[in-house]
From Swiss-Prot:
It comes from Aeromonas salmonicida (strain A449). Zn(2+) 1 binds at residues 69, 109, 145. GO terms for biological process: base-excision repair. Binds 3 Zn(2+) ions. This is Probable endonuclease 4. Endonuclease IV plays a role in DNA repair. It cleaves phosphodiester bonds at apurinic or apyrimidinic (AP) sites, generating a 3'-hydroxyl group and a 5'-terminal sugar phosphate. Zn(2+) 3 binds at residues 182, 229, 231.
Length: 281
């Protein structure tokens, strides 16, 4: 089964995300468990945790249908020891929040070398940061997102992702979230059925489909290979529709959250319905 949804607002409490997902016809969703643009946040209240779990149970959302995202401030490959320590502490806090909510994934951008250390050294720091956090937690899988490669961001190439996974000691608790817009911006051509098949064959060969835990389903305002991160609605922009047809008709994308981060939330319900319509009977 395809689990399709969007990154919904947690305004007013994480327990409110479930109703927002249901309102757009979703059977998957993403959320922030805290303000994504602040380092510190109040702990989740027991009341919020109970309400979230109860709402998920009533609506039929299991942990594998939900893809929490961490703060944009965190940089697990930070070249400065103080910045790295701050990022690691914040990342562990995010994992602990997922633990409290009974969730099994935490999606995150790997980090950036900031032009201060070699790329390879920063990739090693990211893997070491993941190991550090996993040793201090349980039950939550660290889900690395491929990036557009904007600036000095790591994780834009399949080789980067494979290197990061290779450095993680507990392979059962690491995975990948594949973002269609980011891949396109990074130079992976998803515009035709043939090129889609090739990209996903390369992904399987270099990274491995066994590590795919979720996807971000996005159109692209950016141009191909531009290394610029600019999302668009699914049927607008430069990416085209071939990749969405491919995803909806390939059972390797079953059973994982397929999450919209498209730019017009007023049409998320329509986009979800359209994606479902692409599946061949």
């Amino acid at each position: 089964m395809k689990y399709i949804g969007a990154h919904v607002s947690a305004a007013g409490g994480v327990e409110n995300t479930i109703a927002r997902a249901q309102a757009i016809g979703a059977n998957a969703f993403a959320l922030f468990t805290k303000n994504q643009r602040q380092w510190q946040a109040a702990p989740l209240s027991e009341a919020s945790i109970r309400a979230f779990k109860l709402a998920c149970e009533k609506a039929g959302f299991r942990p594998e249908q939900i893809l929490p995202h961490d703060s944009y401030l965190i940089n697990l490959g930070h070249p400065d020891p103080d910045g790295l320590a701050k990022s690691r502490d914040a990342f562990l806090d995010e994992i602990k929040r997922c633990e409290q909510l009974g969730l099994c994934y935490l999606n995150f951008h790997p980090g950036s070398h900031l032009k201060q250390i070699p790329e390879a050294a920063s990739l090693t720091l990211v893997s070491e940061s993941i190991n550090w956090a996993l040793e201090r937690s349980q039950g939550v899988t660290a889900v690395i997102e491929n990036t557009a490669g904007q600036g000095t961001n790591l994780g834009w190439s399949f080789e980067h992702l494979a290197t990061l996974i290779d450095g993680v000691e507990d392979k059962s608790r690491v995975g990948i979230c594949f973002d269609t817009c980011h891949a396109f911006a990074a130079g992976y051509d998803l515009r035709t059925p043939e090129s889609c098949a090739q990209v996903f064959a390369d992904f399987d060969r270099i990274v491995g489909f066994q590590y795919l835990k979720g996807m971000h389903i996005n159109g692209a305002k950016c141009t191909f290979g531009s290394r610029v991160d600019r999302h668009h609605s699914l049927r607008e922009g430069n990416l085209g529709e071939a990749v969405f047809h491919h995803i909806m008709n390939d059972d390797r994308f079953d059973g994982i959250p397929l999450v919209l981060e498209t730019i017009d939330e007023t049409i998320w319900g329509d986009e979800i319905s359209w994606l479902r319509s692409l599946a061949k009977a």
